[in-house]
Amino acid sequence: IYSFRAADIKNILDFTRDYPEARVYRLEENYRSTEAILRFANAVIVKNALRLARALRPVKRGGEPVRLYRAEDAREEARFVAEEIARLGPPWDRYAVLYRTNAQSRLLEQALAGRGIPARVVGGVGFFERAEVKDLLAYARLALNPLDAVSLKRVLNTPPRGIGPATWARVQLLAQEKGLPPWEALKEAARTFPRAEPLRHFVALVEELQDLVFGPAEAFFRHLLEATDYPAYLREAYPEDAEDRLENVEELLRAAKEAEDLQDFLDRVALTAKAEEPAEAEGRVALMTLHNAKGLEFPVVFLVGVEEGLLPHRNSVSTLEGLEEERRLAYVGITRAKRHA
């Protein structure tokens, strides 16, 4: 499952051919999961042709059957997960929710927060804390409130538009000298500084966005993405994980579509962020990708997004090797569960 880090399953499959004197020991006795969970996991992985034959045998006999739930969409799926966890009750750290892509965490975070259930994103950051999401939220906050100096500083040169630290320092100096808020100083600098074309373009962009703040939030963000060519910036700045970041952007658009307007959307974001504040990891539901779940175990595991395009992922279904990697990921997810899946 670590092929994205250049791991190759052939190193395992061809081991005895490369080292004919080697002896193979199969560790097949499983102390973690119940018989029902292992039977389900084995039924998944047995479909793989490229594997060493091995069937886990449970120490824990019996157990409840694995439950399957078919949701109408991702929002209803997140609602079901949150309601089930609320029904089963604390301690919250006995639950894990596993998914294929980082972007899937957003609805889960919001559904759990809406029921007052503390959660944490393991091996990553919460959806609204991801850099590309924070960039777009900063534009929204600035459009609604030009006095938001923190948001102004974040987006001033994101994507890069030729406004460097030296220019920003001069704007701040102007603000101090004239007793102006940074945004007003920036507008004056755009009028009076030499070679201020980048500043003028930025001011015009923000004023364009201000005209959209009372309309649909999704339309605001779509205009922003087009006006800044933000997707192209992500592809150029983050070639290794641009697709993951673009998925987060698409998820943000889906979230924006649910809000009445931009202010309503930012209020919802603030509520989710507030619900994620409580401290100790021990008392929280674990949200994580299947890759981050390797080696961990939980009494109760939810595996979400088991559907064509997500698991198996759309980038992996065109080859046998890719499809089998996806099946291994599903197997890893199922076998994280100790009692219920």
Model-derived features: where do they sit?
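Conserved helicase NTPase motor core
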Residues: 1-14, 29-33, 224
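Flexible beta-alpha connector loops of hexameric P-loop NTPases
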Residues: 1-5, 25, 69, 317-321
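Switch/connector loops and helix/strand junctions flanking conserved nucleotide-binding motifs
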Residues: 1-3, 33-39, 46-47, 53-54, ...
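Well-ordered alpha-helical segments embedded in enzymatic catalytic cores
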Residues: 11, 77-84, 135, 251, ...
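Helicase P-loop NTPase motor core
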Residues: 20-23, 28-119, 141-145, 212
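Conserved helicase C-terminal RecA-like lobe
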Residues: 91, 105-117, 130, 137-341
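Conserved helicase motor
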Residues: 99-102, 123-131, 252
